[in-house]
Structures are given as structure tokens and as C-alpha cells.
């Protein structure tokens, strides 16, 4: 895992690159790569790359970046890991390619020179990278299918800048810091800033599963090479049928293979362990490979003796699979002391991520460089309540479209219900307005504020401009375009393309990189998705998490299998008891406003 950045002065009237800006941007990402730093400038100073390295595969200096091809005609700055790089390297060697390192970075560079953008679907891993191709005077950028690794860019019409973090681009000093109403409104609606927006007008995020090029004419529009909705639609259309045994075998084999790939490393790999099925399955499958595995669990004093305390069951799983286990306890005082750093590391405002920040901190304090996480299991195997609730809501409220008298009566009641917050939740008044489509029902279920509410937070003018620029319903609809085909696959596409991508994965990235830790997610893998999607879809509404938990040869402890799902939460209400505005009516909304007001570089004056 690393931090990458670069500048391209593509327009003839643009000044040569300021090497100091390149360095400032790079050094703003020091925690992403404490092991090495590098800079490359083209002879005409029209192109420059920076890199901060966290050494995981081929830890020698010869694998440092930016990496220049043997021919001198291509330069790469790369962030992430390619788990199948060894097989790809063997394939290239059979075609006559020679290598100077044993790194996955060089495999990407050699593949690009040979195959160009056509290589992207062959890369199994998490990545964001940029390649300067001197043969065509073109900058090529790409991001992994799920967007596990971030990539932000800014274009002022003459100069193109990119980096792994928003705050790194800002640190360079070459872009405007004007806030983007769309990014702010997006955060208030969703609890995160929806891709491709950021909190700044000048900075955008390259969408997951896409690439783009920058030529002398400037940047092209991002081009998608992976569509999750398409993969799910194709799996539905295949109409495959399986016996229970066949289905279980397919899922077990595919998940086991993904875990094996995610263990590829030249440094030790650990794993986060909770009381849930996802992390337990990952740990069980990792230990099947025979490696000595360290695990860590985060516990909170406030949860001791309650259902939310995951430490006791995590310890049971650790004993079951023979891991070297540590339990780290987080107190309110430790939280308050670390909160300013957490908010500064956040990069973009997020409703979540504090839990990830502290478990990554615990792993880093144990000396880890790489950790496995069970993130992604709920989206892939239907573990969230949204898989049941959203189709049910649509069936119920969809009837109102055919009952105009009832619909009109409900519509007339909306203003009164919205004002009477003592009797009605903020969302209740707008149920009929939104719950007649998948995008509307998803916004109601996962949303923080609703479009009708945000003016009370930021004022009428910003709300109007932000909503217009954001187009939240169209943004959500894109996640299920093309139509994945069934209620299950529509919700899976929504959860994976929105909540997982722009919330969970982004939070894992900033939280882990703040502690120079690489977090890998074996259940978030495009190769795995293609393998298991037909089998999961064929379950006809049953919970796929049961088959995920059945994947290990040595079953998960019965207490974990029987435990009611609770999610990985932190006791924020107790920790922020000193702040009456937050705790007086605690929930997602007050915490979101706290983050927006108290955040680091992105703090917004309201």
C-alpha cells in the first residue's frame, strides 16, 4: 500500500511543473508509505510523479517507485497489490518479457507496455495507478473494480493533478479550496461523499472500475471496464441450478481461493477478528494454509458483559483456530485523545470509520503491516436487513400508486407530519414520496437526511444548488443500471456500489493508512463475485451467509453461528457525553454534523 501523486502540464501555455508542489503533495501522504519516497520528472518538466512506499511485496530498494521501464518509455506510480502477479509474470515471461525485480509493480508496468488498457480485467487485486507513456505522450490512470484504493484528480484546463488523497492535492497548493455544495449535500444525504464528488469543487474521484487518459488535449471522460450490475445481471440470466451440495462447494472453493490470494506477501499478515461470521470465516480459511496467523479484537469498556462485547466470542474463535490473539481495550479517554487525529486523517467527511480507525491503530501498535478484514460479506451474501426490507417496502407502498385517493391523502399529511417531530420520525412524512422505486427506498433506508431536510442544515441556497448538482436519485439509479434483474441482485448492486464503495472501503483506506497499515478484503474481489454470484442468486432468498460460514473445513464455533448479527459499532454516545449538543438527541444526524463542523481540512462553516 502506498501514496501516489503526479502532475501533467498538458496545455502548451501551462508552466513547467513546480517540483516543490510535487514534493508537498507526496509528503502529505507520508503515513501511507513510511518505508521509501521517490520522485520522477520528465526531461522537459511537463510530467512529474511522486510516490510514498509501504513495502509489502519485494521489499528491496530495486522495487521502489516511481518505476521506469527498462526501455525508458514508460513510468509507473502504483498503489495497491496485485495478488495474481506471479501467474501474470509467468505468462509474460513465456511471451519473452524479462524482469529486474520480483515485485507486482513491475508486472503491471510490463503488462501495460504489452497490452495497454486491455490488461485491467486480468488484474486480481486492489489498485490505483498512473502510467506515463512516452511513446504516445499519454497519461493513463486506472482504479480497481470495487474502488478499494482511491484516486483523486483535479483539472484546471491546463494542468492535471492526481493523488491518493484529497488533502494531498490541497497540500500542493495548486488547486482552489472552494467547497462543493454537491459534496456537502451528498454527505448529509448519505453519510459519505458520493463518488465521483468530493467536498471540493476542483477535485473529483476517478470512479471505481474505470480508467482515463490525459493527452495534449486534456483529460478524457472516465471509461468503465467493470460493471457490478452487469455481472449480477449476467448471473441471473444464466439461470443455473444447483443442488445444496454443489452450491456449498462452489462458494467454499471460491472463498478459499480468494483468501489464499490475499495472503500473498513478503511480510507477515494478520487478521481482524470479531464475533461475526465474516471475519471468523476469513481467519479459519487463512489458518488452513498453515501460516502462523496473528489476530486482534477491539473491545470497549462500555460494552463489557453485553451482547455488543465481541471480545469473548472472538477469543473462542482464536483458540479454535490456533491464532496468536490479542485483545485491545479502548477507553473513552483514549478515544477523546485520538479523535482530533482521526478527524484529520478522515480525508473526506464520513459518518462511519471511527471503528476502523481504532482497530487499525491497535493492529499498528502490535507492529503489523498487513491485516485481513471480513468487510464485504454482507453485500455479497445478503447479510443486511436491506435485502428483506427494501423489496417488502416496495411491494407495500407500490400499491399506493394504484390507489390515488390514499396517495393524495398521505401527500396532504406530509407537511404536518414533517413538522411534528415529536410524533413522527423525520423520514416518516416522506415515505410515500420515496418508497415507490429502488433508488427512493434505498435512500430512505440508508439515508441520513432526506433531500427535503437539508435546507434546515445548510440553508436554502446551498441546499438547492447542491441537490441540483448532485442528482442523488440519478446517482443511486446508476448502481442498478443495467437492471440486475431480481430484488436480491438490485439490493446487492446498491449496497456494493454505494455503501460498500463510498463508505466502508473509503473508511478502511483512510483509517488504515493513517497508521501505515495495509488492509486487505478477500470478500471484495471481482473474481470471487463472478464465481459465486450464480450460486448465491440461486438460493431464492435464503441467507447466503450460512454457506459462507460453512466454507472452512473446521466449522465456526456454534456460539458464533447462533449469535444475532449486531455489526461492528463503537459507543460514541458514551464517549461524547461531554458534548451536550451531540448526546442530547444522539443518532447519526448529530454525529454527522459534529464531523462536518469539527473535521480537519474539510470542516464546513454552517
Task: Describe these PLM feature segments.
Residues 1-347, 356, 553-563, 586-606:
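Cysteine-centered catalytic environments shared across enzyme families
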Residues 1-4, 10, 23-24, 43, ...:
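Adenosyl-5′-phosphate
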Residues 91, 172, 380-383, 531-532:
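Residues that scaffold the ATP/ADP-binding catalytic core of kinase and kinase-like folds
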Residues 145, 157, 358-421, 443, ...:
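Active-site adenylate/phosphate-handling loop in enzymes that bind or generate adenylated species
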Residues 273, 374, 500:
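Conserved S/T- and glycine-rich ATP-binding loop of Class I adenylate-forming
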Residues 340-344, 386-389, 575-577:
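Short low-complexity, flexible loop/linker segments enriched in glycine and/or proline
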Amino acid at each position: 500500500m502506498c501514496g501516489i501523486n503526479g502532475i501533467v502540464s498538458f496545455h502548451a501555455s501551462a508552466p513547467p511543473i513546480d517540483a516543490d508542489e510535487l514534493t508537498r503533495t507526496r509528503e502529505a501522504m507520508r503515513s501511507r508509505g513510511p518505508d521509501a519516497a521517490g520522485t520522477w520528472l520528465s526531461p522537459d518538466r511537463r510530467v512529474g510523479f511522486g510516490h510514498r512506499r509501504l513495502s509489502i511485496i519485494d521489499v528491496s530498494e530495486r522495487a521502489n517507485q516511481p518505476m521506469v521501464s527498462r526501455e525508458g518509455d514508460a513510468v509507473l506510480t502504483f498503489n495497491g497489490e496485485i495478488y495474481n502477479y506471479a501467474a501474470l509474470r509467468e505468462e509474460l515471461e513465456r511471451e519473452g518479457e524479462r524482469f529486474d525485480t520480483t515485485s507486482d509493480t513491475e508486472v503491471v508496468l510490463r503488462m501495460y507496455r504489452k497490452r495497454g488498457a486491455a490488461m485491467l480485467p486480468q488484474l486480481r487485486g486492489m489498485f490505483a495507478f498512473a502510467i506515463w507513456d512516452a511513446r504516445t505522450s499519454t497519461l493513463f490512470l486506472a482504479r480497481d473494480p470495487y474502488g478499494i484504493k482511491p484516486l483523486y484528480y483535479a483539472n484546471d484546463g491546463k494542468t492535471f493533478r492526481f493523488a491518493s488523497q484529497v488533502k494531498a492535492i490541497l497540500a500542493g497548493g495548486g488547486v482552489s479550496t472552494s467547497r462543493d455544495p454537491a459534496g456537502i449535500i451528498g454527505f448529509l444525504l448519505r453519510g459519505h461523499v458520493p463518488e465521483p464528488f468530493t467536498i471540493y469543487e476542483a477535485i473529483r474521484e476517478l470512479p471505481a472500475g474505470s480508467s482515463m487518459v490525459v493527452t495534449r488535449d486534456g483529460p478524457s471522460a472516465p471509461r468503465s471496464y467493470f460493471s457490478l450490475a452487469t455481472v449480477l445481471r449476467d448471473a441471473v440470466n444464466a439461470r443455473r441450478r444447483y443442488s445444496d451440495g454443489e452450491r456449498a462447494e462452489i462458494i467454499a472453493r471460491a472463498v478459499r481461493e480468494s483468501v489464499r490470494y490475499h495472503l500473498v506477501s513478503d511480510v507477515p499478515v494478520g487478521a481482524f477478528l470479531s464475533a461475526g461470521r465474516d471475519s471468523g470465516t476469513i481467519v479459519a480459511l487463512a489458518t488452513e494454509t498453515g501460516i502462523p496467523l496473528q489476530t486482534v479484537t477491539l473491545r470497549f469498556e462500555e460494552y463489557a458483559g453485553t451482547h455488543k462485547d465481541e471480545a469473548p466470542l472472538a477469543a473462542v474463535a482464536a483458540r479454535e483456530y490456533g491464532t496468536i490473539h490479542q485483545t485491545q481495550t479502548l477507553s473513552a479517554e483514549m478515544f477523546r485523545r485520538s479523535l482530533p487525529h482521526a478527524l484529520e486523517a478522515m480525508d473526506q467527511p464520513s459518518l462511519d470509520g471511527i471503528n476502523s480507525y481504532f482497530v487499525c491503530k491497535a493492529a499498528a501498535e502490535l507492529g503489523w503491516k498487513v491485516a485481513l478484514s471480513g468487510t464485504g460479506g454482507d453485500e455479497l451474501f445478503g447479510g443486511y436487513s436491506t435485502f428483506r426490507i427494501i423489496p417488502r417496502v416496495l411491494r407495500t407502498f407500490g400499491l399506493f400508486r394504484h390507489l390515488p385517493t390514499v396517495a393524495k391523502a398521505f401527500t396532504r399529511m406530509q407537511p404536518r407530519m414533517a413538522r411534528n417531530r415529536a410524533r413522527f420520525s423525520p423520514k416518516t412524512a416522506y415515505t410515500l414520496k420515496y418508497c415507490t422505486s429502488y433508488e427512493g427506498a434505498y435512500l430512505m433506508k440508508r439515508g441520513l437526511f432526506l433531500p427535503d431536510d437539508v435546507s434546515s442544515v445548510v440553508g436554502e441556497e446551498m441546499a438547492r444548488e447542491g441537490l441540483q448538482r448532485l442528482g442523488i436519485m440519478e446517482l443511486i439509479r446508476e448502481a442498478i443500471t443495467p437492471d440486475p434483474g431480481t430484488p436480491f441482485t438490485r439490493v446487492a448492486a446498491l449496497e456494493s456500489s454505494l455503501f460498500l464503495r463510498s463508505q466502508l472501503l473509503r473508511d478502511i483506506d483512510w483509517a488504515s493508512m493513517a497508521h501505515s497499515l495495509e488492509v486487505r478484503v478477500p470478500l471484495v474481489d471481482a473474481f470471487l463475485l463472478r464465481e459465486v454470484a450464480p450460486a448465491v442468486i440461486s438460493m431464492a432468498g435464503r441467507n447466503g451467509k450460512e454457506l459462507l460460514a460453512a466454507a472452512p473445513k473446521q466449522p465456526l464455533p456454534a456460539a458464533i453461528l447462533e449469535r444475532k448479527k449486531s455489526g461492528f459499532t463503537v459507543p460514541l454516545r458514551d464517549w461524547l457525553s461531554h458534548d451536550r449538543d451531540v448526546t442530547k438527541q444522539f443518532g447519526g444526524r448529530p454525529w454527522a454534523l459534529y464531523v462536518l463542523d469539527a473535521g480537519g481540512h474539510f470542516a464546513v462553516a454552517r
